């Protein structure tokens, strides 16, 4: 099991400095939110991509994954009834696949709650089918570049589409592909009625990436979420992927969050 930390909480930091802080806190990976690079994925030059890889390598960390894929974009949506919108979305996701592969990330996390809500005027079934079509259209690029797209179930207060791990797993089964798998997020799982360890065990066959956070949106160990049974379940299923710290409350500061989260994770996974 490897530990990473998401970079967006280091607001305004140069990427090399983020990698330095991650390494200093004990992480071996950084999860990259493309919007933090300040421009669309297709505008990031080969030289800039190389610089990101080299910054990570210089500080002894990997770029583990990318997430918040469609954040800070306009006019993109995976289940829009407008075929032109879906075409643009597919094209941009392919750009993100190439960006991810170019910087060394082998996992892309599809959360993007606003760009997946059920579009106005269509049924949930129609939204499902359109989303499946969108993901199927990017499958060749995923396979070509050796990248896995992980669908992230999110709580109903964030989106009305793919709210449970069971729903995400059902969609994943439509593809039967090692390149479309599952991410589980502790905060999101806290909204489900089923205990988090049971969700982990039930989805062992498709679980590829994991977000560690507290139900209160802070880092692991900052709130009341008990990670001991969560860590036990991950070890029970012999999970070998990344455990990545993702927070939504950036206080008191990124270094404190990184250090205390890592200390807590080490204690529960030891």
Identify the role of each PLM range.
Residues 1-26, 50-53, 57, 104-106, ...:
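Histidine-acidic metal/acid-base catalytic patches
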Residues 16-17, 55-59, 75-181:
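Active-site acidic/histidine proton-transfer and metal-coordination neighborhood
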Residues 30-36, 65-75, 112-113:
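Short, conserved active-site loops that position catalytic residues or coordinate cofactors/metal ions
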Residues 31, 65-67, 109, 150, ...:
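Conserved beta-strand positions in the central sheet of alpha/beta enzyme cores
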Residues 33-53, 112-119:
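Glycine-rich, proline-tolerant flexible connector loops at the mouths of alpha/beta enzymes
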Residues 36-40, 72-79, 116-121, 157-158, ...:
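A short acidic, helix-capping loop that chelates divalent metal ions and anchors anionic groups
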Residues 42-49, 82-86, 121-128, 161, ...:
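Flexible, glycine- and charge-enriched loops at secondary-structure boundaries
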Residues 55, 63-66:
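Conserved alpha-helical segments that form or flank metal/cofactor-binding pockets of metalloenzymes
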